[in-house]
Design a protein with these regions (language model features):
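Alpha/beta-hydrolase active-site loop
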Residues: 80-102
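A catalytic-pocket lid/entrance helix-loop region that shapes and gates access to the active site
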Residues: 146-158
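Short beta-strand immediately N-terminal to the catalytic nucleophile in serine-hydrolase-like folds
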Residues: 107-112, 136
Length: 158
């Protein structure tokens, strides 16, 4: 597996990320959208690259402008999840998909975790040629989404 840091241009400042390439024949690509206030090197982005590359997929994870809770840019401008907007997040995902297309990987599989899962559904609607969508801990939606919790049986003791 080959790993390299990447920079994705936007209308403001570039988005940092990482691209993992399999050591064998490339069969496709996958683009990962991280959860709220997370980043490209935490959570599922720590174990997914190896699994995706084993399947022959190039795997890209990147920071949206709303990554982490709060930071500063150029030692002055406050940035991060505390200042993010959904419109900016949707745009960042589109920038990343465009960057992948420019690298020769059009229409990647989309993986979205939590808030990234919510954003990924919009991305797939906007990009109908997307071959697959994988939701990781995204909101459950549907008729029972607003019911009281406790019936999910999330713990081993349940």
């Amino acid at each position: 597996m080959r790993t390299r840091l990447i920079s994705i241009p936007t209308d403001t400042f570039p988005l940092d990320g990482v691209m993992y390439e399999p050591g064998s024949k490339v069969l496709g690509s996958a683009l990962y959208f991280h959860g709220n206030t997370m980043n490209f090197y935490t959570g599922a982005a720590r174990f997914l690259p190896e699994a995706m590359c084993a399947l022959g997929l190039v795997f890209v994870a990147f920071n949206r402008r709303g990554h982490d809770i709060l930071s500063t840019r150029a030692s002055r401008q406050a940035v991060g999840g505390a200042y993010q907007t959904v419109a900016e997040s949707v745009a960042d995902n589109a920038y990343a998909a465009t960057w992948m297309k420019e690298q020769g990987y059009a229409n990647p599989i989309i993986l979205g975790h939590s808030y990234g899962g919510m954003l990924s559904t919009q991305h797939v609607v906007d990009h109908p040629a997307t071959p697959a969508l994988i939701l990781l801990s995204a909101g459950r939606g549907g008729i029972a989404q607003d019911t009281t919790g406790g019936t999910e049986k999330l713990f081993a003791m349940d």
